[in-house]
């Protein structure tokens, strides 16, 4: 898959490009309205490089835009991609942004600055810690939850701490999320056939969660190799073939 191309994967669409590209998003979304934004953007923690000392032979690719940057730069980056998808949101919508402790404040500030509401902080509690250089090894990731305007929540009184095992280490992506966790968020905030947007789809876990819950995923990924991984995972799951769009 090449930059600028868009593929149809059953009821889903995948574009290779930048989540801040307004024209690309307009083509991808077309006349649809997005009910859920569920994204795992780069955290500005250089996740692959920071672990290179642990495993010098690691085959993981560097994540695009994951270099260490200032809070101000990261807030501007977040504001830009939020503003790009904002015109395509349904009147009732939900926003889920995975993030790290380090970039929590700039992300919340960007959500508020773009007119969004920061409602709650959810925690993905992993069953094992992530090895690294910090004094306290992280065993969690944060999920910023909010919306623009109004929202719908389908499950009464879910919990803010979401316990799911970290996926086994995979060559497909260094920060892969559990499909079960994504399914839970999608089911809480959308109905069958509604649209879920992921502008940083990585290896495609959000798209697979949409396939399993009968939602439509509109996805963007900057890295062509990860785009191909998304297509391969979906084709293996469904037995269908992705088709390039004109």
Q: Residue ranges of each PLM-predicted region?
A:
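Short alpha-helix adjacent to the SAM-binding motif of class I
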Residues: 225-236, 240
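Core catalytic lobe of class I
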Residues: 1-227
């Amino acid at each position: 898959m090449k930059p600028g191309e868009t593929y149809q994967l059953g009821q889903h669409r995948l574009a290779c490009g930048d989540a801040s590209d307004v024209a690309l998003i307009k083509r991808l979304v077309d006349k649809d309205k997005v009910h859920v934004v569920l994204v795992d953007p780069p955290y500005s923690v250089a996740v692959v490089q920071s672990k290179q000392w642990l495993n010098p032979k690691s085959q993981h690719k560097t994540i695009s835009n994951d270099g260490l940057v200032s809070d101000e730069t990261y807030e501007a980056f977040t504001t830009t991609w939020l503003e790009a998808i904002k015109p395509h949101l349904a009147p009732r919508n939900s926003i889920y942004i995975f993030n790290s402790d380090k970039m929590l404040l700039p992300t919340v500030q960007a959500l508020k600055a773009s007119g969004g509401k920061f409602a709650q902080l959810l925690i993905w509690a992993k069953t094992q810690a992530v090895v690294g250089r910090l004094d306290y090894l992280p065993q969690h990731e944060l999920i910023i939850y909010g919306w623009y305007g109004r929202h719908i929540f389908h499950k009464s009184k879910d919990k803010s701490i979401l316990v799911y095992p970290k996926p086994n280490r995979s060559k497909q992506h260094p920060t892969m999320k559990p499909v079960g966790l994504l399914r839970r968020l999608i089911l809480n905030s959308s109905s069958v056939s509604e649209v879920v947007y992921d502008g940083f789809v990585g290896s495609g876990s959000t798209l697979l969660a949409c396939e399993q819950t009968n939602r439509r995923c509109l996805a963007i990924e900057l890295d062509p190799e990860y785009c191909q991984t998304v297509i391969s995972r979906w084709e293996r799951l469904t037995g269908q073939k992705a088709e390039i769009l004109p």
